[in-house]
Amino acid sequence: MRYNKEEIEEIKIKFFAQVQDEYDYFRKKVTKKGIEGVYADSLQITFYKEVYRYLMYDNLSEDDYVQFLGEPIIKKLWEVFTVSELPRQSRDYLRQLVKLYRENEKEQRRAA
C-alpha cells in the first residue's frame, strides 16, 4: 500500500513517539536495578542508546516507518543482535583488538 506525504508524516510522528516511549521505558527499567544492574546490562544499554539514536536521527525508508510502527523495534533488534551478531561480533572484535595491540607494540618497538 502506498501512502501520501501527509500519511507518511503522521506515521513518522507516531513512530518517533513510539521509539521514544520504548527507550524511556527501557531506561527506567534498567535504572531500577541499581548500579549492579547497570553494569550487568551495560552492553544492552549501549545497544539501545545507539539504535535509539539511529532510529530517531537517520532517515529510514518510508516502508521501514510503516513496518516498524506498533512494534517494540529496539527490543526486537536486540533479540536479533544477541542471537546472530553478538557471539560472532564479540570474538571477532576481541581478535581484532588483540591483533591491533600487537601491531602497535611492534611499531613502537621499531620506532624506539
Question: What role is predicted for each listed range?
Answer:
Residues 2-112:
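Acidic interaction surfaces
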